[in-house]
Amino acid sequence: MTILNHTLGFPRVGLRRELKKAQESYWAGNSTREELLAVGRELRARHWDQQKQAGIDLLPVGDFAWYDHVLTTSLLLGNVPQRHQNNDGSVDIDTLFRIGRGRAPTGEPAAAAEMTKWFNTNYHYMVPEFVKGQQFKLTWTQLLEEVDEALALGHKVKPVLLGPITYLWLGKVKGEQFDRLSLLNDILPVYQQVLAELAKRGIEWVQIDEPALVLELPQAWLNAYKPAYDALQGQVKLLLTTYFEGVTPNLDTITALPVQGLHVDLVHGKDDVAELHKRLPSDWLLSAGLINGRNVWRADLTEKYAQIKDIVGKRDLWVASSCSLLHSPIDLSVETRLDAEVKSWFAFALQKCHELALLRDALNSGDTAALAEWSAPIQARRHSTRVHNPAVEKRLAAITAQDSQRANVYEVRAEAQRARFKLPAWPTTTIGSFPQTTEIRTLRLDFKKGNLDANNYRTGIAEHIKQAIVEQERLGLDVLVHGEAERNDMVEYFGEHLDGFVFTQNGWVQSYGSRCVKPPIVIGDVSRPAPITVEWAKYAQSLTDKPVKGMLTGPVTILCWSFPREDVSRETIAKQIALALRDEVADLEAAGIGIIQIDEPALREGLPLRRSDWDAYLQWGVEAFRINAAVAKDDTQIHTHMCYCEFNDIMDSIAALDADVITIETSRSDMELLESFEEFDYPNEIGPGVYDIHSPNVPSVEWIEALLKKAAKRIPAERLWVNPDCGLKTRGWPETRAALANMVQAAQNLRRG
């Protein structure tokens, strides 16, 4: 029984973000479709070759996507919303981009599909839309074309397909309500057709992703698995693939399925290998997800070997990444600025492939010398002084309940804030960032590269902040922001100014579409050596009589959008960050900043996948926010912002944050999200986002007014704010001005009644 290795997927964007650049060039009309397609082909060929060279036996095909793999699956099944369909019924790459972005080089613009987080990761998928009586047919053959590509290059391949039940679970019903699970029998024939096509190509194994099987699914959904997989069996071997959690609670459902193998995430799940071996059918292959696909840490391969060695030779076994390597940067070897000791603690996607090769070889041979050598740096890290800061650990241990309480309740604070700010009804504001123009990015880059001295850099940033204030005053906004010209990314910027973080040059991971992020890495205890945002906030406030918001990223979001340590709990990291940012709130307040926004867009996405684990997470997540904010005086207004959220199941915790104002992303869901605030009788102020900043389309005054009137039916108008869905960093100035002018006009119309 020779053990093989494989990955569940590989990063798509390219080491230098080639895919992003090609997408954006095509969208802007600066390159042709053929040029875009050529970049995709080149990246796929390179990535297959890199994995093969690193020692991977079975290469994933179908993990590449032009925007998102769930959207690719929608097109595969012919699930194209009516508003995005071509007149002749055809589907092309522009159809895909219109669903993702709301517009493309061809076709009519229309509202983009809703976007939400992929399970509990920082990747976003485009939510499939389902309507009653919908028809499905094999429409978009990208998967088959890419399999042909890989076979022509001589690779041993394993196609990757999002499973039918997870696909339905991830979608939403539009229009007349019905049970979307009822569509299962309509999509299964398309899956059968795809599997038949793969069988014709001589494919032995297909990785069929059903991560929904790690959730606490309703019984009806669990019951659907057996008939669905009965219909899919027989043409190729199916590797039922799960990740992000363990499968033990649903193992009875899984073991009844007519599949030939199971992949389990042995990093994030609590599954016991011996129990899995005992309960799985003896002729099933077990794919052991031993290498963390979601983090950047080098694995202790001696531990991984010990975890799996007892079942070697007792059943067919593969070793794999825990999930797709999509969530990891590509290659550590190009990081030239990382300190050698710190660099020795990391492994990116290609290094993780190498780890899988080392592990496979050791399991096949019994020789573990190479594993011990590889694991030495990560074992040495446990005692490094760069990891432990006794002062931080002491301060954390001394936290009391009082540290997470504002001095007075919201009603008392609101009165003090009204007296201080005297804002009109329907106050208008933005979420924080303004367009990051080429000039701003060039300025930061030149400074970073040493081509610009500190004085000239600061003069340049000050000029952009001044421009942002002038623009906002001209537009008539009520509460201003400084525009964040000095910030590259809302998490990276804070990480750069906090001890305990390190940064990469090329550690990019895909967030959605062409958007990539370069998450900081938490390597040790977190503290704040000096004020971070105070100087620029103070400068912006000096330019205007209107209030300017101080802008902070909250502790849970910094945690969730960074690569965390693996040697302490997430709670510990979040509270260390909260204490550091608490000092920032106090310093902003002392500098005369009266409104401070602490963004927590990631609070909900950090939820454990199983509801039974939620309470513990929410308790420390809320406490971290409150530790951060509680130092503020009564007449300092604390705002928070959240996006891509379903709130109804965590409203108690949202209210427990005790923010004076919460701004939320609601435009794509047509204000549906406000229902949960209404039902809960949310007591504080709310700014429901009135237009979707992820789309370049400019909303009309009438559209915004209609949304606000809809909002006022759910929330008393005196507690409503008017704002976009999210920051405006990725937009251009022309559409930003136009959209904000319409937003301000809508608010003024409502004030006049």
Swiss-Prot record:
Record: residues binding L-methionine: 431-433, 484, 599
Protein name: 5-methyltetrahydropteroyltriglutamate--homocysteine methyltransferase
Binding site residues for Zn(2+): 641, 643, 665, 726
Active site annotation, chain numbering: 694 (proton donor)
Binding site for L-homocysteine: 431-433, 484, 599
GO molecular function: 5-methyltetrahydropteroyltriglutamate-homocysteine S-methyltransferase activity; zinc ion binding
Chain sites annotated for binding 5-methyltetrahydropteroyltri-L-glutamate: 17-20, 117, 515-516, 561, 605
Family classification: Belongs to the vitamin-B12 independent methionine synthase family.
Domain of life: Bacteria
A GO BP annotation: methylation
Keywords: Amino-acid biosynthesis, Metal-binding, Methionine biosynthesis, Methyltransferase, Repeat, Transferase, Zinc
Gene that produces this protein: metE
Enzyme Commission number: 2.1.1.14
Catalytic activity: 5-methyltetrahydropteroyltri-L-glutamate + L-homocysteine = tetrahydropteroyltri-L-glutamate + L-methionine
UniProt-listed HAMAP family: Meth_synth
Needed co-factor(s): Zn(2+)
Pfam families associated with the record: Meth_synt_1, Meth_synt_2
Cofactor note: Binds 1 zinc ion per subunit.
Role noted for this protein: Catalyzes the transfer of a methyl group from 5-methyltetrahydrofolate to homocysteine resulting in methionine formation.
Species: Escherichia coli O45:K1 (strain S88 / ExPEC)
Pathway: Amino-acid biosynthesis; L-methionine biosynthesis via de novo pathway; L-methionine from L-homocysteine (MetE route): step 1/1
Claim: Coiled coil is one of the keywords in the record: no
Disulfide bond sites: none
